[in-house]
């Protein structure tokens, strides 16, 4: 498809084609297994295209520095209530525009330059923002790693307690970007609170599993603060949030969000976030349960196809993630590229035994099933995907040959599940409203 105006302006044609080609490729022709991505429902996407993307708001609802925000203010409060209900707290801050900004806000609110934070090792899953190389280090806070038990694929609780007692950090950070089992919140909370530290749990990857009630809510287990993005297992627009147990902690983070890290907070995402929150309220448990079922089935199928899947002794996974060690097949970077040629999208990932210099071609590949689950795939489909991966990585078949199989397979999964359904006619009407204000 080419629109007429692109014939007159070649530069515009290139921009148009890159955008359209990407959309068709990723939405209709790929199997996306990136653990940090998801897709919104058509209703959420259409409401994302609203006039609020052109508008500015500084401050909190009904206390803004700009006029013209009466509907925005009501919408933001409504979105806070929806997310708060899902997380069982009255204290939700939606203004962070990413998970990293949410993390930075908490770090700044509860620690100062020169203070210490105890975190999960980066090779064992800590997000880069939790490290000396990222946001934590940028704020001058010292990263101290807690020990990790590779056999259990989880934090070494006794070792972590000793580290916390010894260094007396201001913040202890759980969660991250690579983890397949829940972190031990109660035990670590006791240790953190015994030295006066705040326990922050970065639930970006598992927010949908928590709001879907298949993972326990860390705020009910002893965590003081949750930070998160809103677009992984929680299938909303890209953005961030902070939730706290107490009003005092909420006030502290709110004073830091604005004006320290955020001025305007990308208002157009609020409607899509609220819609996704309602979708999780009504369909979230079914969605989250299927995610975990699919992840377990995928891990088992990968193992049966000859892959070295992490966590076998623990049932492989309790989350959306599956981790494979592909050292014997050439490493994570090489195989991620080969799989991309076959339209299977994954990412390389460091594993606990990797050294810092291995970052360009680490041992692992991280896989996530939250998006394919939203496209309606079930356990049997995980077996098919595992076979596609075996053909590329282990059997060394031509990725282009497998690509054709992948494209054909994806034709069966073009409708988003676990969300509100609207008709094609309603989509067209809503699009006209969003683009032109036509009612």
Swiss-Prot record:
(6S)-5,6,7,8-tetrahydrofolate binds at residues 126-128. It is an enzyme of class 2 (transferase). Pathway: Amino-acid biosynthesis; glycine biosynthesis; glycine from L-serine: step 1/1. The modification N6-(pyridoxal phosphate)lysine is found at residue 232. GO terms for cellular component: cytoplasm. Its EC number is 2.1.2.-. NCBIfam families: PRK00011.1 (NF000586). This is Serine hydroxymethyltransferase. The gene is glyA.
